[in-house]
């Protein structure tokens, strides 16, 4: 069995990201931190509900086992 290292999200820190979560949940926010389990911290977050409604949720910590995908919304240089 191979050892998995920490996710390489350094290039996404302090950038606006889109996070797809299990249960068809979507969150947008600024990535402020993460750990080896893909637990992440977002600030200025907005949750997009299934019906399209957007709800400001501010700062949020998301457990890594809920994360399906993380995508930056800022242009990478």
UniProtKB/Swiss-Prot annotation:
PROSITE patterns: SM. One of its GO terms (molecular function) is RNA binding. Pfam families: LSM (PF01423). This is Small nuclear ribonucleoprotein G. It is found in: Nucleus; Cytoplasm. GO terms for cellular component: catalytic step 2 spliceosome; cytosol; nucleus; post-mRNA release spliceosomal complex; precatalytic spliceosome; SMN-Sm protein complex; spliceosomal tri-snRNP complex; U1 snRNP. The gene is smg1. One of its GO terms (biological process) is mRNA 5'-splice site recognition. Belongs to the 40S cdc5-associated complex (or cwf complex), a spliceosome sub-complex reminiscent of a late-stage spliceosome composed of the U2, U5 and U6 snRNAs and at least brr2, cdc5, cwf2/prp3, cwf3/syf1, cwf4/syf3, cwf5/ecm2, spp42/cwf6, cwf7/spf27, cwf8, cwf9, cwf10, cwf11, cwf12, prp45/cwf13, cwf14, cwf15, cwf16, cwf17, cwf18, cwf19, cwf20, cwf21, cwf22, cwf23, cwf24, cwf25, cwf26, cyp7/cwf27, cwf28, cwf29/ist3, lea1, msl1, prp5/cwf1, prp10, prp12/sap130, prp17, prp22, sap61, sap62, sap114, sap145, slu7, smb1, smd1, smd3, smf1, smg1 and syf2. Residues 4-76 form the Sm domain.
